[in-house]
Amino acid sequence: MKIICDFHIHSKYSRAVSQGMEPITLSNWAERKGITVLGTGDFTHPGWLKELKEKLEPAENGLFRPKSQISNLKSQTRFILTAELSCIYTKNGRTRKIHLLVLAPDFQAVEKINAQLSWSFNLVSDGRPILGIDAHNLAKLILETDERCLIIPAHIWTPWFSLFGSASGFDTIEECFEELSPQIYAFETGLSSDPEMNWRLSQLNNKTIISNSDAHSPSKLGREANVFDLDNLTYDEITRVIKENDKDKFKYTVEFYPEEGKYHFDGHRKCEISLSPEETKKHHNICPVCHRPLTIGVLNRVESLADQEINAEGRVPFKSLIPLEEIVSDVFSVGVKSKRVEEEYLRLTEIYPEFEILLDISERELNSLANPQIAKGIMDAREGRVTRVPGYDGVFGIISVTGKKEAKGRTEIKKEKQQIGLF
């Protein structure tokens, strides 16, 4: 049974998150996307936890579904209890800022974790709480509370808040998690890296690489995801596959093109400076406009820690895609949130779920279903025939199947290069 999972999202109780991130809306969007199992996000927040208990009911072991009396239709979506925790602390003489994704087997485990954390930390102010605790100590607390929990370092390359982040991360897993390192089974790529980039680190050779959307609004669900082939859809089976890196059951991940991630290249957003690692080296990591340190992006950081060449043998494969809304927007040359894009997106996903359109439907059927340019864009995205302007310092990159968005992005980059030449 093909199962598509997106474990990392946020609720309406997190900062800068859509009010549409609530159980029934999430369930409806998950079905439109073709997502089978969706993380709840934010289980540490009392308000969100209360809402989850009120609106969800047990389904398969460790999974939940919307209550039938609340949802208009019998939902096929399953929820798994998840949260992202932000650890900010000092270790080995440096400030560390690490985000951890946590999967929990049931509400009892969640309540025990929350009870432990609430003694020392404020869980009310943000769905993704900021905790002044060493990531190692937090992992130990959670695993001692319930060993069935799964702890996954989130978006491990993001400069500011991640395990390997250039600004406040570590160089090795062991430096962060010490003796618990063998119990950290999986690592999340984040939008600015793909599995190939992670394969360049030998310390990740025996670890599972997963990908999730980190969605802050319903339409962003599934922009990255994990595809399993499971005989039994349960919490224990999902976590077993992840822990064991079971390649027979873990079929592939769905990825952003990493250049679209907002920290792929180095740069300085305020000065509109975007640089490749080679260009950054020439400028000695200093912004050529304001002469302040550049934000070192994911590609550069991977290069600095890499100790082996890319080898796909024995790895869980991946497929790079462009979200359907973005393809439609690119083809129609209108904003992704425009009415024209919304209408076409809703029309197409009434016929098939988005993932089926992006991954499975034949070119012939796509041409009968959609505008020929949209069909071509989907096929081009599948085959990697796209143009790319990398993101940098919090600015999303541009991935285009038509070249229209790319041309605009290249013009902006060219202006930045000309500006560099003045200093």
For every predicted segment, state its role:
Residues 328-423:
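Low-complexity, acidic/Ser/Thr- and charged residue-rich accessory regions of DNA metabolism proteins
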Residues 1-95, 386-387, 399, 404, ...:
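An N-terminally biased module of ancient metal coordination in phosphate/nucleic-acid-related enzymes
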Residues 250-316:
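Cys/His-rich short segments
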Residues 15-18, 49-53, 161-168, 199, ...:
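Histidine/acidic-residue-rich catalytic or RNA/ligand-binding cores of hydrolases
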Residues 8, 42, 79, 102, ...:
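Divalent metal-coordination and catalytic microenvironments
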Residues 2, 50-185:
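Extended substrate/RNA-proximal surfaces in nucleic-acid metabolism proteins
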Residues 207-223:
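Short acidic/histidine-rich active-site segments
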Residues 8-12, 155, 216:
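Histidine-centered divalent metal-coordination motifs
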